[in-house]
């Protein structure tokens, strides 16, 4: 089986979505019957994270434009490689060319619209909902997010699976003072 992972989040600033993808796929790489294709601009960065193995492949993205990437580049890559499944965060390509796994981490822009521009809310409500409804496998990270997806997008509860956020192994056992210092935290709410 060939599985493409949209790893473009590894090209930008560090965020929770990156930790989620890294946690899932570093553990899945041991499944040698799956060929993993990680797609991003910075292939060297991905190589440093996921390493080298016979079932690990890297695909360099050429476009930095999200619309071009989702409307043109991914459908072409998926077709060229003969990908069986592709995993996207929030928004899948406009043209469906394989089975899709979509993770929607949250819908904060719908839960708290006052903190988001109207254009962002309208665009993402349409794209997230379309991606969620078309997904062959729809994932989210918590019961709260699952309930919000059901409420906002009217998607059957049975179609949504929870894959909780986790802590990366390298962060396990870090002393609390080190964590507080790295976060610049002086308050006592972390104990």
Model-derived features with residue positions:
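Carbohydrate transferase catalytic cores enriched for Leloir-type hexosyltransferases
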Residues: 1-191
């Amino acid at each position: 089986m060939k599985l493409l992972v949209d790893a473009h989040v590894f090209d930008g600033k560090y965020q929770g979505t990156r930790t989620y993808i890294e946690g899932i796929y570093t553990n899945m790489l041991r499944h040698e019957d799956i060929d993993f294709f990680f797609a991003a601009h910075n292939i060297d960065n991905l190589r440093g994270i996921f390493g080298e193995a016979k079932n690990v492949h890297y695909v360099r993205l050429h476009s930095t434009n999200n619309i071009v990437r989702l409307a043109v580049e991914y459908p072409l890559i998926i077709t060229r490689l003969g990908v069986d499944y592709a995993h996207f965060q929030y928004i899948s390509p406009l043209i469906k060319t394989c089975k899709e796994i979509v993770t929607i981490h949250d819908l904060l822009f719908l839960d708290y619209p006052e903190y988001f521009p109207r254009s962002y809310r309208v665009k993402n409500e349409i794209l997230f909902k379309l991606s969620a409804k078309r997904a062959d496998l729809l994932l989210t990270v918590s019961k709260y997010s699952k309930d919000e997806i059901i409420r906002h997008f009217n998607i059957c509860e049975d179609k949504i699976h929870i894959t909780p956020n986790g802590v990366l192994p390298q962060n396990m056992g870090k002393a609390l003072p080190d964590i507080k210092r790295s976060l610049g935290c002086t308050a006592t709410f972390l104990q």
